[in-house]
Amino acid sequence: MRVLVIRHHDVDTAGFIAEAFEARGASLDVHLFPDDGPLPGFGGVDHIVVMGSVSSVNDPDPWIAEELAWVRAVDRAGVPVLGICFGAQIICAALGGRVEAMGGNEIGWFTVDSADEDAVPAGPWLEFHEDRCLLPAAATVLARNDAAVQAFRIGRHFAVQFHPEVDGPQLKRWLDSMGAAAVQSAGLDPDQFLADTIREEPAARARADRLVATALAIRDS
């Protein structure tokens, strides 16, 4: 199985999601967009993972328009996508939905109300966003909470608003490079947030593995 990972920041990795795909025999190709140049072709790709970004899908940057068009082309080709946070929002916007600002943020560890906890466990999940999806009619909600739709499927695609990939080192890179002020604005202590994330790692790894199983089941359904 060949998996293409699209990331948007050099401090990001696919973390627990990459581990779960690799445990199933996948080889991962990683492309940093837009820094590494145009989005790659997807011939011979079995699954795509689109990761998060500090940007909003609604920002006027040319690369976002390019990525929206690319996701539409991926959809027409029938290649399944797993979207994470910004990746979920770009699937939503590319396929007929909208993305709106929440008027605040959701940062920290939160549970979700899941339609099927075998497919999408209740969590807790690490959240780090200030936009949310308004889904197209073709989408099916798989989990939500008071802040946002937290997981959905549309066709062969599966998307989550939270960050199942994040471990302690990943969060530390975020806090060091771009995230400490946002965490404080949410009323959290960055050091405690990091400690909570490290403590949660074993359970978070298992939940991420469950999500990859769900993504593959949706792909094959």
Positions of predicted regions on the chain:
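Short, charged N-terminal beta->alpha structural module
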Residues: 2-24
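Amide-donor transfer/coupling interface in amidating biosynthetic enzymes
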Residues: 5, 100, 113-221
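Cofactor-binding loop segments of dinucleotide-utilizing enzymes, especially the Rossmann-like FAD-
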Residues: 6-8, 33, 86
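Flexible gly/pro-rich beta->alpha loop and the following alpha-helix that scaffold active-site loops
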Residues: 18-82
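Short glycine-rich anion-binding loops that position phosphate/pyrophosphate groups of nucleotides
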Residues: 53-56, 87, 165
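Catalytic nucleophile loop
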Residues: 74-98
